[in-house]
UniProtKB/Swiss-Prot annotation:
Catalytic residues (positions): 102
GO BP terms: carbohydrate metabolic process; peptidoglycan biosynthetic process; UDP-N-acetylglucosamine biosynthetic process
Molecular function as annotated in GO: magnesium ion binding; phosphoglucosamine mutase activity; phosphomannomutase activity
Transmembrane segments: none
Gene Ontology cellular-component terms listed: cytosol
Keyword Transferase: no
Pfam families named among the record's database cross-references: PGM_PMM_I, PGM_PMM_II, PGM_PMM_III, PGM_PMM_IV
Enzyme class: isomerase
Species this chain originates from: Rhodococcus opacus (strain B4)
InterPro entries xrefs: A-D-PHexomutase_a/b/a-I, A-D-PHexomutase_a/b/a-I/II/III, A-D-PHexomutase_a/b/a-II, A-D-PHexomutase_a/b/a-III, A-D-PHexomutase_C, A-D-PHexomutase_C_sf, A-D-PHexomutase_CS, Alpha-D-phosphohexomutase_SF
Protein name (Swiss-Prot/TrEMBL): Phosphoglucosamine mutase
Amino acid sequence: MGRLFGTDGVRGLANTELTAELALQVASAAATVLASPGSGGRKTAVVGRDPRASGEMLEAAVVAGLTSAGVDVLNVGVLPTPAVAFLTAELDAALGVMISASHNPMPDNGIKIFAAGGHKLDDEVEDRIESVATGTATRRAPTGAGIGRVHTVPDAADRYLQHLTTALPNRLDGLTVVVDCAHGAASDVAPAAYRAAGATVVAINAEPDGLNINENCGSTHLEGLQKAVVRHGADLGLAHDGDADRCLAVDAGGSLVDGDAIMTVLALGMRDAGELVDDTLVATVMSNLGLHIAMREAGISLVTTAVGDRYVLEGLRSGGFSLGGEQSGHVVFPAFGTTGDGVLTGLRLMGRMAETGQPIAELASAMTTLPQVLVNVKVADKRAVAASPVVLDAVLAAERSLGENGRVLLRPSGTEQLVRVMVEASDLEVARKLADELAGTVASV
């Protein structure tokens, strides 16, 4: 068996790769590792999910696994991933479990686990959970009164909405937003949050039926949102994914405002308000060179991490910084949460618009996106490519030819025998030519 945990929990085709049996084993193992009995009474676990059909089956299995290990379950129902992380801390739970495959198609599902305080797990803790789940370490199995009980949390959504309200320093009166909820976990709370802050809200794709999550909508399919923003004459559009841990935006003309541009707007606003710790932003190596240039021109330092919001979080924690994120729209505000929060990002973005009186297109123009070409190359051995002197020489030659006007990044896939070749340059044709040449070199190894 390969490693259970990927870059964002356990994920796979529901009922084939991610079975009820596996969900029970993982939940029981997580409870064994993260909720050891001690003083203060029985430990608790928050459980939430997105609305995809398999979530009900997996929720039942997760609840069974947790209670079989002696943990009481606080079931919060359908809520975004960041809400589950927040409630794990708010309710003083020993762990939290979110059942979701995020932006993946409906047939997939996943299990994300949070430690006490709503923090994502590090590799060492994941390895310990995996050891218990696969039977190489002993799981806890109490009997009688030691078995956990199940409780619902009827005010879970209200608690999360109140939390979001406290994170927004100003009102959004006068702004009109179209929000694409991806028929996902934020279909109720996202429109409610934006309305509570004073915005006029047009909600689309906010009628989940268990089967339509992420189907031609949400942050991976922006076409419908772009048309709706123009049709309604809205100030902007916001797109969430199935579990609402990310947010992308669309300006009044229907043009994309991606995660890099969103971070630019937020970083400049937080700097002006004295909220940007050490005038530093944390982003991944996949962020566009245009973000680097914009931050440098603004006097803001940029710390780069590996791809994945868990690595952004590590960078934020290690430096004590206050803003980080990814091009894909995961944005983290450590003062208000422990993971990417799409609804909070949308609120803060509109807050900057309300504060300045400027449209989002004007605010986002502080960053110019450089042309980027990405080529996926199938390889026999990713490690051989990484160690190849021929590939290294080709990368160095490409970097010399670009100088300060571009960059090159080779990144092995975390799940497939692929190497991703990315080239950015001020000229699209130059980027294409270099990317194709490098892809050919990688393929020849």
